[in-house]
Regions:
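Acyl-donor (CoA/ACP) binding surface of acyl/acetyltransferases
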Residues: 1-15, 19-22, 61-172
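Secondary-structure transition/hinge residues
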Residues: 24, 28, 49-53, 94, ...
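Conserved GNAT-fold acetyl-CoA-binding loop/helix
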Residues: 25-46
Length: 172
């Protein structure tokens, strides 16, 4: 399977809406509107256009020519300005196929080249074993667990904090 990361464009809006209304939100933060509307997509695509390459890298994940998800690395501010955070989501039917593992490898390379950062962090709800494995396969280190740190849908979760430094071994 050929995995590519490509820049988002307004021509992708309908696909973005479809994906965002199809994803499993069990372990996602609440920042992605639900339902995901045309207005949501317009706002987000404008923000991506303004931020990409400056303080963030946003890419659509393309598997065998089809857009199947999103991945991003966003630079932090103030005293955390050399840090960034990775986030991703994928169509449910494309999970467990190695797509996200490859996409994380690629986005980390891009982020360390394009952004003025030395560190990428990943925050994962403790029961999200698949996402934890994705980060670990890409040389992210488990740096700690924040106990009872997340409250979502009436449940309390521990939050696993992962980190990858620019000098950490490349996956592969």
């Amino acid at each position: 399977m050929k995995i590519e990361l490509q820049k988002w464009s307004f021509e992708d809006k309908e696909t973005l809406i479809t994906i965002c209304n199809s994803i499993d939100r069990s372990y996602l933060a609440g920042r992605i509107p639900n339902p995901y509307t045309e207005e949501s997509a317009d706002w987000w695509l404008n923000m991506v256009g303004e931020s990409d390459g400056k303080n963030a890298v946003f890419r659509k994940i393309v598997a065998d020519g089809k857009i199947v998800g999103n991945i991003s690395v966003e630079q932090k501010e103030d005293v955390y300005c050399k840090n960034s955070e990775i986030g991703y989501f994928l169509l449910p039917e494309r999970c467990s196929k190695g797509i996200i593992t490859e996409a994380v490898k690629k986005i980390c390379e891009i982020a360390f080249q394009e952004l003025d950062v030395i560190r990428i962090r990943g925050r994962v709800y403790e029961p999200n074993i698949a996402s934890r494995k994705v980060l670990e396969k890409n040389d992210f280190s488990l740096e700690g667990v924040l106990r009872n740190a997340v409250f979502k849908n009436g449940e309390i979760y521990n939050l696993c904090m992962y980190g990858k430094l620019a000098g950490d071994r490349a996956n592969g």
